[in-house]
């Protein structure tokens, strides 16, 4: 039955939600003994549940990229209590995905401090209910979910490539995506001048659509980064946990939070069930390189990922992202190209 959803273009639907809730993927059992796993956004929801699984499966080191060290410490303590992992297994490194300077500092810190990184799970994401600019001048979800995630991924590539060569098997770079990317229409992103400016325009902001758009752009970014990366060194993929009861709606108002709770009460699986995909994605193998991992299978992404029109838009988008990042870091393309 899963093939009914993995072999056709990804798209949200009640049928897909019901199937995923009723048929959660198997809980991963692969050992991560001796491995170092980096995960952003591990304080709550999917990130917390995935981090807990990595700890239970024996990861020697867990690097937590956290905006709040206080909240990171709370998550660390709770995971230590739940899994009985060693007290020095989890290390907190501050990371504000709304700040290029913080991203650069984080990437340098983990590159310098850890001999190898076996997998990086880029889970941090936001879904603000109203328009808000980041300090870098972009709408917050566009900043965090897309531009900053792409920048962090690129800055981590040298360490991941080096790690893959050192351990004799590919490291992993995982983007956390959403089936909702398949719901995005061409009109939502196509613009005669600039895709980023269109998505950044407050006049176009609708919070549900905006989150889905950022997840489409994130998949486009993943594909371009994967195209510049050998899967013999780093497997780059995108993982969709499915609709989950997670903390992504933490900034919603009372009414919206109530509606969200009712909808997810009917259709959503638990964050624990969804987090299984985040863990299995870093064992998915070379077939998942540049791919969309959902329901524990390499799946067909949305039409704006696979169609000729989507590929043309993706190419334009990526050129714009590199233009933005080049202004922050003149070496960004050299780093990406390895």
From Swiss-Prot:
Query: Listed GO molecular functions?
Result: oxidoreductase activity
UniProt binding sites for NADP(+): 46, 71, 96, 123, 211, 215
Q: Which PANTHER family match?
A: PHOSPHATIDYLINOSITOL-GLYCAN BIOSYNTHESIS CLASS F PROTEIN-RELATED, SHORT-CHAIN DEHYDROGENASE_REDUCTASE PHMF
Enzyme Commission number, as recorded: 1.1.1.-
Question: Does Acetylation count among this protein's keywords?
Answer: no
Question: What SUPFAM superfamilies does the annotation carry?
Answer: NAD(P)-binding Rossmann-fold domains
> Pathway involvement?
Mycotoxin biosynthesis
Q: Which family does it belong to?
A: Belongs to the short-chain dehydrogenases/reductases (SDR) family.
* Source organism (scientific name): Phaeosphaeria nodorum (strain SN15 / ATCC MYA-4574 / FGSC 10173) (Glume blotch fungus)
Can you say what this protein is called?
Short-chain dehydrogenase/reductase phmF
Origin: domain of life: Eukaryota
InterPro entries, alphabetized: NAD(P)-bd_dom_sf, SDR_fam
What keywords are assigned to this protein? NADP, Oxidoreductase, Virulence
Task: Report the protein's function.
Answer: Short-chain dehydrogenase/reductase; part of the gene cluster that mediates the biosynthesis of the mycotoxins phomacins, leucine-derived cytochalasans with potent actin polymerization-inhibitory activities and monocot-specific antigerminative activities. The first step in the pathway is catalyzed by the hybrid PKS-NRPS phmA, assisted by the enoyl reductase phmE, that are responsible for fusion of the leucine precursor and the polyketide backbone to produce a 2-pyrrolidone intermediate.
- Give the enzyme's main class according to its UniProt record, as a single word: oxidoreductase
